[in-house]
Amino acid sequence: WKIQLENTTDGYHFPMVHKSWMASVDSETADMMSFMEDPQAETHALGNGHSVGIMATAHVDLDEDDGTEEIQPRFNHLVEELEEAGESPERIRRYMRSMHGCGFNLNMFPNIAMSSAFFRVLIPISVDETEIWHMALGMDGGPECVNRERLRIHEHFQGPYGFGSPDDAEGWDRVQIGAGGNPDMPILINRGLNREYRTENENWPTSHVTDETGMREAYSMWKKMMSDD
């Protein structure tokens, strides 16, 4: 279950493991998730094993909108439907900017995660088996057409026929096989230690979203809970 927990705030794997998904979406969505060289894309260790990874910085707070972001053409049919329903331009813009969910992934130690627009519950079955529940998130009271489209986006990534989850699962299987080849081999989680710093107000350990700050936080808490100290 720990490898699935790592996955949520690990930005490093995304462009490689999810290359097929990136190739299957429109260029605007792919650009939105191109955070490898974005200095504002960071992971914060929140304490008690929790962490948050900022993936799409422009969508972290939907109340902050300078008006420069263009609505993705793939959602033009929704814009037209909402205009016909009498929705204001401001509300329509907010709906469209929220189509992919929030701009961050949140890990709640030990087994709950929220990734953009879905919840994930990790249920350990044995040392080498984990059951994962995915729950798509919609808008409470939001337009039906918007929630329907968000569900289609969820299905495109998740599920056995999605372009995202099957690649994650394949990676998890290979990591499990590799770890079983030498159980005594130490596994390093030191990526980004050289550039990790603490935020001024919260004192959160922080580094780039492609670093392993969130993993170090989770394993530190796991080690603490498993000890007799």
Where are these regions (language model features)?
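C-terminal catalytic domain of Rieske-type non-heme iron oxygenases
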Residues: 1-229
